[in-house]
Structures are given as C-alpha cells and as structure tokens.
Amino acid sequence: EIMPSLVGSEMCIRDSMTTGNLPAGSQSLSSDMREQMTVLAYTDPIGKVSKETVSGHLMIGYDDLYSIQYFQDNRMPYWKHDGKVDIHQAFEKGEASYEDLMRRCGSFDSSLMSETSAVGGKKYAELCAIAYRQAIAAHKLVTDKEGTLLFLSKENFSNGSIGTVDITYPSAPLFLVYNTDLLKGMMNPIFYYSESGQWKKPFPAHDVGTYPVANGQTYGGDMPVEESGNMLVLATAIAIVDGNADYAAQHWEVLTTWANYLLKEGLDPKNQLCTDDFAGHFAHNTNLSIKAIMGVAGYGKLAEMLGKADIARQYTEVAREMAAKWVKMANDGDHYRLTFDKPGTWSQKYNLVWDRLLGLNIFPKEVAATEMAYYKTKQNKYGLPLDNREDYTKSDWILWSACLTGSMEDFNALMVPVWNYANETTSRVPLSDWHFTSDGTQRGFQARSVVGGYFMKMLEKKLGK
C-alpha cells in the first residue's frame, strides 16, 4: 500500500500535521522556504484517538546501489547478496517479518539492559544503551569478490577516513562481546592491504581511504606503534573470545612483522602520531609504550595457542622485560608519567586493561592499583581528563580505565561521572566521545563508533575476569 506523501519545507509540513492531512499535489518553495530544511512526510490514516488500541508502522530505507569502492571494485551492500535482492524485495520481506523482527528487537533490548545492569548497574546500562546502535551504525557491511566480510567504519566528524585502525580498536569491546566476525570484518581490509603488497611498510596502515572509497591510505601521517599494537592486541582478543587462534594463523606472517617492529620501536616510542594526539604528538609516550608491550605479549599468547612454544616463550619473556623497564622509566612516585622524560605529568593508562582481561599478566598488579588511586584525585564533575595537559577527555577511554583493577568500587568511581556527562550535557548532538570534564560540553566528535568501547565491562564479564 502506498501512503500519502509530500516533499516540502519543514514548516509547511509541520503545520499540516496539526490537521492530520498533507496538502494535495507538489509544493513550490518560496525563497523563505528554501532556507528551511526540506523534508519528506508520510501519513498513515489509522483513525481517531479512542480507547481501542490501533497500531501502524512505516518502513523507510535507502538504496545506495553500491556502498563502497574497495580497491577499485565497487561493492554492493551486504543485504543485496551480490544483486540477488533488490530494495523492493527487502521491503516485502521486512513487512512479512515485521512482527517477528519487532519481537526479536524487543527481546534483545531487554536482554541488553538486564545484562549490562547486572554487570555494571543501571547507569552503566543506560550508557551502553545509547552507545550500542551508534557504534554499529557508523559502518558499512559489504564483502569482497571472494566473499570475505568487510565491516568498514567511517571516521565521523574528524577526517572521514574509512577503515581506520584506531577507530576499530576503541570500538572493539562491543564486537568482542556480541560478534567477533564483525571485528574481523574491520581488520580484514588492513590485513589485505599489507598482504597484497600494496602497503609495504613494517607496520599497519592507518586507514584504507576516505569514505566511501577504500583504495588505500589517504591520511597524511602514519601511526606505526599505535596501529601495530592495535592489530596485535585485537587479534589476541579475538583468539581468546573464539577459543582458537585460527584467524591469527591466517595472518601470521604480517603479525610477525608487526610484532618485531614493536620489539624494536615500542618500548620508548619516538615522536610519532598516536590516537590521542589532540594536544600535539610527542615522544616517549608511556601509554603508547604499554600498547606496544601488550602487542608483543599478545603475539606470545597467540604463538602459545598455535603450538609455537619457543616463539611464545621468547616474546612473552621479552614483554616482561619491557614491562619491568617501563615501571622504572615511568615511575613518578604516586603515579606514572605521561612521558618517560617529564616528571610531574600523568595520563590515563587505558591500554593496560588488556593485561588483566586477556590473562597476559605482564605488569605487576600494583601498577593498575597505583594509577587508579591517583585517577580518583584528578577527576572533575564530568569525568577524568585524558591527561594533565587539558581539561577534556575521551569517554571511551574512561570506561576502559574504569576496568583496570576489576574493583566495582573503582569502576563506579570513574563510570558515574561519564553518565553524568551523558545525562546533563547541554550539547544536543549524537553522543560525543570527546568532551570537557569541567562543564560537560562537547569538545568535538560525535556519532562515532568508538563508543563501542563502553562495553569493556561487559567484555570483562564475558572473559570471566
């Protein structure tokens, strides 16, 4: 059934809604109207309001024909099944399955709220609820010519990069909890880029293009330690969640290259870009060093799972040696520094969360405990700043830092101010992950997939930690 519809100015259509009837015919737009938002309106006449319950629904969809250009090949959206399904058939199937789809959605909503509440309380559940859809929606799902799944993110409200590794990394907890195939779909383009010989450097690319064209990195700078650590840690996390290292085995050669890069360059990183370079990039980054150590330790864990005992022993021992050096180099008394060479500085060491969650056990437990105690002295009303340089923070990283010790008291201490931000912010935008901790206003970024990182506490539960 085709419903009455009209394209026109928002003011005209809004006024017509008071009568319940859209104007007949097309609408010519005056100069004043052209300055307004143009909208599409539908009406579904379901009768007058009465005591009897009446329901109706609209189905709204968009056929982008081809979603992504992937290394010179235009790829259809996944739902088209390589052209076997068109938009009309998709609508017909959706209509036929409407009741079942609504039931399944309602069931998942209920389970998400109950499970997240059980793990982290009502406020944590509400944070996860507002993050879930946003984290998934910032991607396009396609396959390559061989049918390999590609789940490509768009770096919203920054530079529009597609398939950015340091966007995949913070979003990963949600997908590790619910569907590792989608996380593999984020990593597959980066593996392909290196393994095909198109990316020749001894560390992963930052991205594979600018959305929606994924023909190779377009970002102006590399993040060598950042992206190497990200890919190795995530490959390890996938193996532990899946219960096997099959995915890592498929990419062992390039993972080995990246692990060896971290052995050489990771302990005391040079002046290079990283994901948190908002206030400028810098050398001797202690949190970036932790990521490198976790990457090396993760490689050792993967080798162990693949029966490569000698390699496992070698890389695990080296990771422990690196961690011991880190503790001495970063020590600043009651906390650990932002950079090895600057006493009196501090930063969130959110990368350390993997040491406990993945069972790597490379760092002394006292490091996380010391950091957590110090964080509690540095919080503002709307959260823990990212480091000592600025008032602003990244809320995804706070939810990681909140899981450093495994203590519920520590988790709540850092999580609740983030809930206060989400609940009280005057910035009425799709959830921003970059905000000021003093007044709760948006600093930048919105509608980004990184809020999947809010699910770190759920991942902790899934891994039995």
Predicted regions span which residues?
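Single conserved hydrophobic/aromatic residue that forms the stacking wall/gate
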Residues: E1-G8
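Beta-strand-rich recognition/accessory modules
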Residues: E10-E99
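Asp/Glu-centered strand-loop micro-motifs enriched in Gly/Pro and often flanked by an aromatic residue
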Residues: S28-K48, A138-T164
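Aromatic-rich carbohydrate-recognition surfaces in CAZymes
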Residues: V54, K80-M102, G160-P269, N285-A303
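Well-ordered alpha-helical scaffold segments within catalytic/enzyme domains
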Residues: G61-D63, S110-A118, Y169-D181, N230-D246, ...
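Low-complexity, Ser/Thr/Pro/Gly-enriched N-terminal "stalk/linker" regions
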Residues: H88-N159, D181-Y192, G197-K200
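Aromatic-lined, polymer-binding surfaces characteristic
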Residues: A125-I130, I136-D144, G163, S196-A205, ...
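Non-catalytic carbohydrate-binding regions of carbohydrate-active enzymes
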Residues: W252-D276, G280, G307-K349, L358-K465
